[in-house]
Amino acid sequence: MSVARTVLITNRRGLHARASAKFVTLASSQRCDVQVEKDGSGSVTGTSIMGLMMLGAAMGDSITISANGDGADEAVTRLAELVEAKFGED
């Protein structure tokens, strides 16, 4: 099963190192493959801090979180909620 959801980055510092680390920790705990894409510029694995940071997602940018495999729906929901909660910042 493949699921995708687009979310808006709303925390002031965007997808920086600490936010990326929180995302990777959660993505790594999922049973499915997680990918993240910004502006159709190609996707990166959701378990790579450097990959996420290389997206350059700043406040006001949208990212698309997609997952494929067992638990994909739950994984995308949980990761989207993390982003929407500003990674616990602000």
Descriptions of predicted regions:
Residues M1-V3, E89-D90:
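Compositionally biased, disordered extreme N-termini, encompassing classical targeting presequences
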Residues S2-T6, S62-T64:
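Intrinsic-disorder/low-complexity, polar/charged segments enriched in Ser/Thr/Lys/Arg/Asp/Glu/Gln
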Residues L8-G51, L55-A58:
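Compact, glycine-rich, soluble single-domain proteins
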Residues G56-D90:
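C-terminal structural segments of small proteins and small subunits
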